């Protein structure tokens, strides 16, 4: 069960969903990440099946979002600091300190083993110039953040955005760990708080396939990019890698899942992404594919 699918299923029932998420949030321990993720997934599955008991109920919610759904700034990850208790703020800060080193260690180990080639390609295309103004869409767990930040030069500056306050704190922890310049901002990708033509490069590591309304996000990314800038993205190879778990609750076939994702405007594959970028005036400048993901760079045509 993943945020982007939950935000579609419950977009018109936010208060009920937020109440559940806030209750669940108080139970999670940031120092028991694997254990808590399993518990979170199990409890989320139970909640979804309780609120949406049948496949037809699920399809009805898909149809409602297809007709009327739109990006909203208050979502299931409504963890901006104004909506957090003091205890949750303290917990988020502690988590940042813990996660900064943890994410750095994970990235260092991954680069030393299975992830070296595609991470090196990604970072090489993000950090091309002598003074980069970097904008990362979707900080998430911080793997892509740490991959870039560890290689930043003295005059580079990093800005990361995520709708989740906890993920923003991941970026803060990583920046502190590597002693690099930058900040994390909790805001929506659908309406970025930046002027036009602000950043020299926009990047995202396994972030787009966790987002909904991707065309809106890409349009905003293009708006804040300088005329000679680049957009560099890492995306998963496996179709519906994360989304499939939600559809599996109701026994959807792959064909049914594909059709639902098309109707609700979720990211699907490289060809679809490149078509959207072409509509925005971008051409593919570089491409690399590994067993688990692909990396693509786009530049203005």
Predicted regions located by residue number:
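Class I SAM-dependent methyltransferase Rossmann-like catalytic core
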Residues: 82, 87-117
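Class I SAM-dependent methyltransferase SAM/SAH-binding core
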Residues: 135-191
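A conserved beta-strand element that flanks and buttresses the S-adenosyl-L-methionine
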Residues: 203
């Amino acid at each position: 069960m993943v945020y982007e699918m939950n935000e579609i299923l419950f977009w018109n029932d936010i208060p009920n969903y937020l109440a559940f998420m806030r209750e669940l949030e108080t139970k999670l321990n940031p120092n028991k990440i694997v254990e808590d993720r399993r518990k979170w997934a199990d409890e989320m599955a139970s909640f979804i099946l309780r609120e949406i008991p049948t496949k037809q109920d699920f399809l009805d919610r898909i149809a409602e979002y297809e007709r009327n759904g739109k990006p909203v700034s208050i979502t299931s990850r409504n963890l901006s600091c104004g909506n957090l208790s003091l205890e949750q703020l303290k917990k988020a800060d502690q988590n940042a300190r813990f996660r900064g080193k943890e994410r750095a260690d994970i990235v260092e180990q991954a680069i030393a083993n299975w992830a070296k080639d595609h991470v090196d390609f990604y970072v090489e295309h993000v950090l091309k110039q002598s003074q980069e103004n970097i904008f990362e869409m979707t900080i998430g767990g911080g793997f892509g953040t740490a991959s870039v930040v560890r290689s930043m030069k003295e005059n580079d500056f990093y800005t990361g955005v995520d709708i989740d306050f906890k993920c923003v704190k991941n970026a803060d922890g990583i920046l502190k760990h590597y002693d690099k310049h930058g900040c994390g901002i909790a805001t929506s990708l659908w309406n970025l708080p930046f002027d036009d033509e602000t950043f020299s490069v926009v990047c995202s590591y396994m972030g787009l396939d966790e987002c909904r309304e991707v065309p809106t996000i890409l349009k905003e990314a293009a708006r804040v990019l300088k005329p000679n800038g680049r957009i560099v993205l890492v995306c998963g190879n496996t179709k519906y890698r994360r989304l499939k778990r939600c559809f599996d609750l109701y026994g959807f076939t792959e064909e049914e899942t594909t059709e639902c994702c098309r109707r609700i405007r979720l990211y699907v594959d490289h060809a679809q992404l490149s078509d959207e970028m072409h509509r925005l005036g971008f051409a593919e400048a570089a491409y690399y594919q590994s067993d688990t993901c692909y990396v693509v760079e786009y530049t203005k045509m």
